[in-house]
Amino acid sequence: MFSIEKNVKNEIIINKSKFITYLIRIEKIEDVKEQIDIIKSINKDATHYCYAYILNSVKHFSDDGEPSGTAGMPMLNVLENNKLNHILAITVRYFGGIKLGAGGLVRAYTKSVTSTLDIASIIKIDFGYSFKISCNFDKKTLVENLISNLKIENIFFDNKVNYTLNCNKEQFEIVKDLLNKNEIEIQELKEVIIKSE
């Protein structure tokens, strides 16, 4: 599975119409509406807000008033052809006064997403876990040896040493067993998308 490493924006002009495409990494379906609302608030005077997204097995698109099949579907095709997932493409169009016709719109929306992908950093992604562990100071060295192969997102100290970690599912199963054997409790476990090495 592939996605973008970070969100990216690009703008092209075709026959006086401005096409601004945003590629946004999404984790859950609620992200789609939230991101579309944000883009609409930034581009209040735009004529169309077309989009396509892929989130696991869910795929959806919208032409937002453009002729049927001329905007959202071509955008979705670009995402599918690049084997992307957990991604939302929103293309905002400011009409420039020249009608492009159905074929011209398909080419314009395709080019807008493709040219934005050209400047994006594409990464391989995998399902994994984010979790926290805490230990007493006397177990700090032991814990750090047990988690040495994991990505440590954060370490903070209070009356204990607290770690926030990310890892893939296979790593998690191994580390979970090691932590349990050493009586170190896993907290706030949640499934996340991680960059695959």
Q: Which residues make up each language-model segment?
A:
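Short beta-strand-to-loop capping motifs
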Residues: 24-27, 133-137, 164-170
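Non-DNA-binding regulatory cores of transcription-related proteins
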Residues: 151-172
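Short amphipathic alpha-helix segments
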Residues: 133-151, 174-176
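Glycine- and acidic-rich phosphate- and metal-coordinating loops
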Residues: 53-54, 85-95
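C-terminal regulatory domains involved in ligand/effector binding and gene-expression control
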Residues: 1-70, 154-156, 169, 181-197
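Short Lys/Arg-rich amphipathic alpha-helical segments
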Residues: 80-85, 107-123, 164
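Short glycine-/aliphatic-rich beta-strand segments at the starts of folded cytosolic domains
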Residues: 121-137
